[in-house]
C-alpha cells in the first residue's frame, strides 16, 4: 500500500513538473519542431506530452531498459494512431560518450533505472527502498547488460542533420 501511494504522489509531482515545462516552452514561442530526441523514453510519457502539445514532424525516443522498452513497444501503435501526423521512432539503446556494452541497474521502480553506480548506503537510496519495496526480500535492482551508442553516430547513420529539441532523463 505504501508503494502504491508513493508512486501516485510521484505521478502528481511529475504532472505539475511537465506542465511547467510545456508552459515555459510555449512562453518562449515554441509551437512546432522538425526533430525531437527523447533520451530516456521510459513508457512513452514524453512522447505523449510533446506530441499532445506541439506539432512535431519526427520524435526519436531512446529507452535503454529492455524490460521498459517492451512496455513502450506495446504502446507504440496507440501513439502512432493518436498522433498520425508525426513519425515516432523508438530505439532500445542507452546513449553515451562511447559505443560499448554497459550494465543497467534495472530497479523495480523502473523510472529510476540507471547505468550509473548506485550508492546503496545513501539516505536517499534507503528511503527509496523502504517506500518502494512491497516485500523486503524482493530484489531492489538487477543488473542487465545493454548496448550504449554514441548519439553523433546515430544521427549520421540516420541522416539527421538537425535536432530542434533534446530531452534527456538521466
Task: Name every feature range the model reports, one short phrase each.
Residues 1-170:
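Phosphate/nucleotide-binding beta-alpha loop and adjacent structural elements of enzyme active sites
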Amino acid at each position: 500500500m505504501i508503494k502504491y501511494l508513493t508512486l501516485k504522489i510521484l505521478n502528481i509531482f511529475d504532472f505539475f513538473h511537465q506542465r511547467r515545462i510545456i508552459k515555459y516552452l510555449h512562453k518562449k514561442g515554441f509551437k512546432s519542431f522538425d526533430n525531437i530526441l527523447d533520451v530516456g523514453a521510459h513508457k512513452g510519457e514524453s512522447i505523449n506530452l510533446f506530441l499532445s502539445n506541439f506539432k512535431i514532424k519526427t520524435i526519436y525516443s531512446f529507452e535503454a531498459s529492455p524490460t521498459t522498452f517492451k512496455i513502450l513497444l506495446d504502446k507504440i501503435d496507440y501513439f502512432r494512431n493518436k498522433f498520425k501526423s508525426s513519425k515516432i521512432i523508438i530505439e532500445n539503446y542507452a546513449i553515451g560518450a562511447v559505443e560499448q556494452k554497459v550494465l543497467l541497474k534495472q530497479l523495480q521502480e523502473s523510472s529510476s533505472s540507471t547505468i550509473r553506480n548506485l550508492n546503496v548506503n545513501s539516505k536517499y537510496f534507503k528511503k527509496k527502498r523502504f517506500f518502494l519495496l512491497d516485500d523486503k526480500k524482493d530484489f531492489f535492482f538487477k543488473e542487465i547488460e545493454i548496448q550504449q551508442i554514441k548519439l553523433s553516430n546515430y544521427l549520421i547513420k540516420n541522416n539527421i542533420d538537425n535536432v530542434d529539441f533534446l530531452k534527456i532523463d538521466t
